[in-house]
């Protein structure tokens, strides 16, 4: 296998910082996705999957969207519950010495959508955060698109789960230590990993 190109090395280094997000990586007039992000992006966005070095052992799956249509595609991914990291060129390619400097300038998550175009009409867009001590759950619900904020305390896992399901969150925030709680597996069955963001304890 040939060594990775400098651009792919740069992509992988940036992607390693955002492993739970689909990385939109700016290359000229396009945002490109590579490797697993490309396969997922192609499938979820119904766009062509191609590859660099097509037909060779070291081919790299890729797909892309024009930069001026990126918002539409990001919106589709958010509606499907994905996070998107937007990586832009942060220096003029004409002035770059070597590889163009790139960095993530924004991370989009399903629970933090404020653009009414990205939201369905009449539906809440709840971001839910919670903590737990024993069998007592503290819950906070935030809809950033309307400014609505509510909080409550609930005893028992079933009551907690029922309240979370009733509010249909787009994203859930939890401390990593919840993964060691006896209720974790039951919670994960209902929400999977894509919807939950784990924060450092």
Regions found by a protein language model. Give the residues of each.
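Basic, polar low-complexity surface loops/patches
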Residues: 1-201
């Amino acid at each position: 296998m040939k060594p990775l190109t400098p651009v792919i090395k740069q992509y992988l280094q940036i992607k390693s910082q955002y492993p739970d997000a689909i990385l939109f990586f700016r290359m000229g007039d396009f945002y490109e996705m590579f490797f697993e992000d490309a396969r997922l992006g192609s499938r979820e966005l119904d766009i062509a999957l191609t590859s660099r070095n097509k037909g060779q052992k070291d081919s790299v799956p890729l797909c892309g969207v024009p930069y001026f249509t990126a918002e539409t595609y990001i919106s589709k991914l958010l509606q499907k519950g994905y996070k998107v990291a937007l990586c832009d060129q942060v220096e003029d390619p004409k002035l770059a010495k070597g590889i163009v400097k790139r960095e993530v300038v924004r991370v989009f998550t399903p629970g933090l959508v404020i653009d009414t175009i990205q939201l369905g009409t009449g539906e809440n867009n709840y971001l839910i955060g919670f903590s737990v001590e024993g069998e007592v759950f503290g819950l906070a619900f935030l809809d950033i698109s309307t400014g609505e904020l509510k909080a409550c305390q609930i005893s028992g896992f079933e009551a907690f789960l029922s309240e979370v399901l009733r509010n249909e969150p787009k994203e859930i925030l939890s401390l990593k230590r919840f993964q060691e709680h006896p209720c974790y597996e039951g919670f994960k069955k209902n929400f999977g990993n894509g919807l939950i963001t784990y924060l450092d304890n």
